Amino acid sequence: PCVKIATAFEPLKRGKNPSIKPDELPEFFDKLINSNTDLLTKYLIQWQLLTMVRPNEAVTAEWTDIDEDKELWVIPAHKMKQTKANENISHIVPLSKQALSLLKKIKSLSSHKSYLFYSSRSRDGYLNSQTANKAIRDNMGYKDRQTAHGMRKIASTYLHEKGVIPDVIEMCL
């Protein structure tokens, strides 16, 4: 009865959020820097890589959520994925030196607005959550190889390879 068991299961397909390998990041950054992508969008992509957040969490980041003195970004529960939002748990993101340095650059462009990644063309006041995907796909040539959400996978893969405890990685994500 188990002879044809393999046909009962679909082979695993590459997910809808593909990602490059961590060792491909230098080339990715080189393409990002040299692309014709808008500067704020470049910063958005870097911010997502440095903070390991979902695209929507990144674009809806507000200056009031950032505590530069404590070097933290507190994402309110209502902006989180449904599971955390239902538990009313804010997500606390410690900001690395690199993230804080990037924050200064972002501030030079958007400190006078509510959102880090503001958009004057959006009725919501911030960039569309697909903005990074469009840049990665169209301006950088990573169609079907990398998505904005897939950047979380790069971080997770890297941390797993470095031997970080899986529960700690999950808490970061």
How does the language model describe each region?
Residues D65-L72, K143-R145, V164-L173:
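Short, polar N-cap/turn motifs at the start of nucleic acid-interacting alpha helices
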Residues S19-P26, K70, S96-D144, G150, ...:
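Active-site/catalytic core of tyrosine-dependent DNA strand-transfer enzymes
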Residues D30-I33, L49, W63, K107-S111, ...:
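Hydrophobic alpha-helix feature that most strongly marks membrane-spanning transmembrane helices
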